[in-house]
Structures are given as structure tokens and as C-alpha cells.
Design a protein with these regions (language model features):
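Non-transmembrane alpha-helical segments in soluble domains
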Residues: 117, 161-164, 168, 218-222, ...
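Catalytic-loop region of hydrolases
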Residues: 5-102, 243, 534-537
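Alpha/beta-hydrolase-fold serine-hydrolase catalytic core, especially in secreted/extracellular enzymes
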Residues: 444-538
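N-linked glycosylation sites
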Residues: 22, 56, 72, 112, ...
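Substrate-gating cap/lid region and adjacent catalytic-acid/histidine neighborhood
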Residues: 248-451
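Serine-hydrolase-like catalytic core of hydrolytic proteins
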Residues: 40, 75-234, 263-299, 455, ...
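Extracellular/periplasmic catalytic domains that process cell-envelope and extracellular macromolecules
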Residues: 19, 29-32, 85-89, 121-124, ...
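Polar, glycine-rich mid-to-C-terminal structural blocks
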Residues: 234-253
Length: 538
């Protein structure tokens, strides 16, 4: 989770310090960006399979907390595991980056939040950037009756909420304004922030089961951990060596995530927003054109014929009625040349040749399937959320990221898919990273190092800064030279971020592509996401 905070005044020190409610924090000065960094600051304690607890440690001026290096990351599978990050249960920490006027030397790409802070100073709207670690997988989102009865479900969300509270209480010590906090990608209490940015992840588009639907997975994990006969199974798991528990958790084939527990999540979020039970703040949200590539790649199923695509849908959505699947197949024709984006392929098409060249499987209906799953997971939910937010009379700004950051030859990014405007492709542009520079671990694709994409990165970055600072992405330093990004309720349109190698291509599109198909996805969200749970109208 990221948060941005407007800066109230400039401040710096050769060894910067801040006095928080827990005492003195000492950071490090980064001369290449003229910034102060405070890294790995604990914001809560994380007892295993229990709710987060406030920090009870104090630091005095003579023995300050050393915030000169990143802290541990929370246990999770995939990128955290494969890319050499230091994982630990002691992981509830955050990082703060703020401007500090001083002269420096060459750039260091390690600090990927530094670019957006640097740009905010150039735009004369300085801000602080805060990134937050929170618990993941089973340790962050345990399911089953035992977890629900103990009140320890959705722990990762509770971590986020406590982090936001810590920021509210302490950000003034770092020069920030607690009344001007914008949350990016997270959910928390409404009194804690004044705006939100949601990219490629919304209130629908992912399974959100009830707690008891996770019981079989919990029982399997308990059995493999030799805790079946324990009177208190949770306490037994708390006492199990992590070296035993961690591989078990990753081997049982259960995707641990948020659950409808009747407590933190009392009902499906889509219905809460529909009924107006949400934090009423300005919202900036958007999707990438090729969001579905990651879903098809993750499925390991690459259809060549319509009956194979049918199997993919039936497997992915077992509660979806066959008549609905037939409707979807009709609305995503095999010959998708006129669709947006086009997805018509054959086995000998350049796409599949390029996929095979890097030892990735392919099928002639790969892009057709990706269009379906991309609409389900991102485009339909993004449109639905923009519509709901606008109906509440709230400022809503919707975007569509179309720039292909990579193309053919294929560059495969583990966990994301084969390039193009795929899931995560916009991240380097939002952060304002220069062309060719990505995150320190090179997990997400870098901004393309050509003039058109460098201009695109700067434009997205400054729009994000304006939204954080002014709650309006049009409040730019040179706004008269820029295309107007209209609110969704006045235009039903998306602001399109696109570029060729040579030229920036900003424009506005009517938000009606694949409208009928997207509506079917949203009409059936109770069956795709909520296990046939259809809440009562209120």
C-alpha cells in the first residue's frame, strides 16, 4: 500500500531526524535526489494469527531508531519469495520519503518512490510518499470458523488501517499535513484519508468468499501441521515452527485472501458502495488494456478452439450458468479484429511465434480469453465503480492505460505476463521513473526508454501529484497546455494514456467499449465473486 501526504514546509538535516509519539527516528539523506529517507519504521506488532498491536517501544534522542535501511517484507508466495527479499513475521513497517533541499550527485535507482517526490517539488506541489508493508497469504488472511470465532480474519486489512492511523498521528513530525492524506491501492477508515487512487484492482473482479467457505483449506493446513487433535487449533498453529508452517501453506493449493467475515467486511464491498456505505472522498481509478494476459497465463490453459475457451470459463467460474457463458462467447467473437483491443490470432500468428520463442505456450484464442478475463477482473469493475462513485456525487476520474511498454519480441515478467499494456505496466509511469529504470528487483517492467514514453511517464506522474495535492488531476503548473481530464459523472469518459516511441498520445474516449459484455460480468458478480450470495436491496 502507498500513501501520499502533502508537505507543509521544507526541512532537512545531514542525518535527518523526526520525533514521533514513540520517540526519535533517524533517517538517511539521499544527496542524488536531495531527499530524506526514513526506512523500515515499525508501525505495529504482528503476533502470529492475531490482530495487530500498537508499538510499545520508545526511542530517546540518545538512542534513536535507525531508519537508514529497508525493513523486512511480510511472508508471501511468488515475487517476494523468488526475488530474494528478506521475509519475516516481524514485518509491519513503513517507509517515508520527503524532499530535503541540498545539493547531490548521481541518481540511484534503488529509491523508486524518490522520483515522484522529486517531480512534486518540480511541480511546486511537494509531497511525502509513504509505502507500507502488511501481512499476506494465510498469516494475513486466515479463513475458517476458528479464525472467525477468534476475530482474527482479514488481518492484512487491519494492518493497513493501523498503518494509516500511525501516519495520521505522526506524519506532522516529518513535515507532512495529516489532513491531506491520499491512499493508493489500500482500504482503511474514512477519517484517515481525503482521497483514493485505485489501479487495476476494484470492489469486484476477484473471489471474495465467506469465512466458512475457507474451512476445508484451514482443516487441510491444520492436518498437515499436526494440529488436528489440538483443543485450540489456532494456538497450535501459533506454536508451529514457521519453517514447517510456511511450506505447508504454499503446498495445499488454497489462495488465502480477504473474506466476508461479518466483522471487518460485513457484506460484499460492491453492495456497500451501491448502498452508499463507503468513504466519500475523491477517487482516481483506471485499468490497463491487457489486464487479462496475466489471468490466462496464470491459468496455464491456452485455448485454440471455442470449446476449450468454454472449459476455461467453466473452470474459472463454476457457479456461472451455462446460458451466461454462451452469451459471453457470443459477445467475444473468435474474429476479434474490430474489438478494442483486437484479439484475433491464429497459431502461426506473430504473437504465438513470439511466445513460443521464449518457451511460453500459446493458443489461437489466447487473446480472446484474455479479453474476457481482463474485462472480468478489471475493465468491468473499474467502469462499475466509476458509475457508483459518480452517482454518490463524488469527484471521479477514470483512465485507460494503453501504452505497450514492451511488445514483440516478448519480454516475460514473472507473475505479470508477456508484456504489452499488461497488469502492472503502468507502475513505472505513475511513479515517474526515467526510461529504462524499474524497481530495484526489476520485477515490474520499466518505462520504455524512448521520447514518447518518457513524456508519458512525466505526464502521468504530474497528474497523480496534482490529484494528491489538489484533489484534481487538472491542477497542473502549466494547466493551459494540457488536455482536460473531465470528471466521470459529467462525461462518462476515460482519460487515455498512450504513446508511440516518438510521440505522446493523450486523448479522451467514451467509456463504452464492450459495454454489453462488461454489463453481463457485473450482473453476475454474485456468482463469479460472492459464491451466489445476493444481498438484499436496502
Amino acid at each position: 500500500m502507498l500513501t501520499y501526504v502533502a508537505l507543509t514546509h521544507g526541512m532537512h538535516h545531514p542525518s535527518p531526524t523526526a520525533i514521533t509519539r514513540n520517540g526519535t527516528i533517524r533517517g538517511v539523506y539521499l544527496p542524488s535526489f536531495q531527499q530524506d529517507l526514513f526506512l523500515g519504521i515499525p508501525y505495529a506488532r504482528a503476533p502470529r494469527l492475531d490482530n495487530p498491536k500498537p508499538i510499545n517501544t520508545t526511542y530517546d534522542q540518545d538512542a534513536p531508531f535507525d531508519a537508514s535501511r529497508y525493513g523486512n517484507t511480510c511472508y508471501g508466495f511468488g515475487s517476494n519469495e523468488l526475488l530474494g527479499l528478506t521475509q519475516s513475521e516481524d514485518c509491519l513497517n513503513l517507509n517515508i520519503i520527503r524532499p530535503a533541499p541540498a545539493k547531490g550527485s548521481s541518481a540511484d535507482p534503488m529509491w523508486n518512490l524518490s522520483y515522484i517526490v522529486q517531480r512534486s517539488v518540480q511541480e511546486e506541489q511537494p509531497l511525502l510518499a509513504v509505502s507500507v508493508n502488511y501481512r499476506l497469504s494465510f498469516l494475513g488472511f486466515p479463513g475458517g470458523r476458528e479464525a472467525q470465532n477468534a476475530g482474527v480474519t482479514n488481518l492484512g486489512f487491519k494492518d493497513q488501517r493501523l498503518a494509516l492511523a500511525w501516519i495520521q498521528e505522526n506524519i506532522v513530525a516529518f513535515g507532512g499535513d495529516p489532513s491531506r492524506l491520499v491512499a493508493y491501492g489500500g482500504r482503511g477508515g474514512g477519517e484517515l484519508f481525503r482521497g483514493a487512487i485505485a489501479v487495476s484492482g476494484f470492489v469486484t473482479g476477484a473471489a471474495l468468499p465467506k469465512t466458512d467457505e475457507m474451512q476445508a483449506g484451514f482443516d487441510k493446513l491444520v492436518g498437515m501441521a499436526n494440529c488436528t487433535m489440538a483443543e485450540d487449533k489456532l494456538e497450535c498453529l501459533r506454536g508451529t515452527s514457521l519453517y514447517n508452517l510456511y511450506p505447508i501453506e504454499g503446498s495445499i493449493g488454497v489462495e488465502w485472501g480477504p473474506v466476508i467475515d461479518g466483522d471487518f467486511l460485513q457484506r460484499p464491498p460492491a453492495w456497500e458502495i451501491r448502498d452508499g456505505n463507503c468513504v466519500r472522498v475523491p477517487l482516481l481509478l483506471g485499468s490497463n488494456s491487457d489486464e487479462g494476459l496475466i489471468k490466462v497465463t496464470a491459468s496455464g490453459y491456452f485455448p485454440n478452439r471455442t470449446n476449450e475457451t468454454t472449459v476455461l470459463l467453466e473452470t474459472s467460474f463454476p457457479r456461472l450458468q451455462h446460458s451466461v457463458i454462451k452469451q459471453l462467447l457470443d459477445l467475444y467473437p473468435e474474429d476479434g479484429k474490430r474489438e478494442a483491443p483486437p484479439y484475433s490470432l491464429s497459431p502461426d500468428f506473430a504473437w504465438c511465434q513470439a511466445m513460443n520463442a521464449v518457451s511460453l505456450p500459446c493458443g489461437s484464442q489466447y487473446r480472446r480469453s484474455a479479453a474476457m478475463l481482463g474485462d472480468y477482473v478489471s475493465h468491468a469493475p473499474r467502469r462499475y465503480m466509476a458509475q457508483l462513485w459518480s452517482r454518490l456525487g463524488l469527484p471521479t476520474y477514470s483512465f485507460h492505460f494503453k501504452a505497450a511498454t514492451t511488445g514483440i519480441p516478448i519480454q516475460y515478467f514473472y507473475g505479470l505476463g508477456p508484456g504489452f499494456a499488461n497488469h502492472g505496466a503502468e507502475l513505472a509511469y505513475e511513479m515517474g521513473l526515467p526510461g529504462g529504470i524499474s524497481t530495484p528487483i526489476q520485477f515490474y517492467p520499466p518505462a520504455k526508454n524512448v521520447s514518447g514514453h518518457i513524456a508519458l511517464s512525466k505526464e502521468m506522474n504530474r497528474r497523480w501529484i496534482a490529484f494528491v495535492s489538489r484533489k484534481d488531476p487538472n491542477e497542473l503548473r502549466d494547466r493551459n497546455l494540457s488536455l482536460q481530464w473531465r470528471e466521470y459523472n459529467m462525461s462518462t469518459s476515460n482519460f487515455v494514456f498512450d504513446a508511440t516511441d516518438e510521440d505522446l498520445n493523450l486523448h479522451v474516449e467514451t467509456d463504452d467499449y464492450r459495454q454489453q459484455a462488461c454489463q453481463i460480468w457485473m450482473d453476475n458478480v454474485a456468482h463469479t465473486d460472492y459464491s451466489d450470495h445476493v444481498p438484499q436491496e436496502t
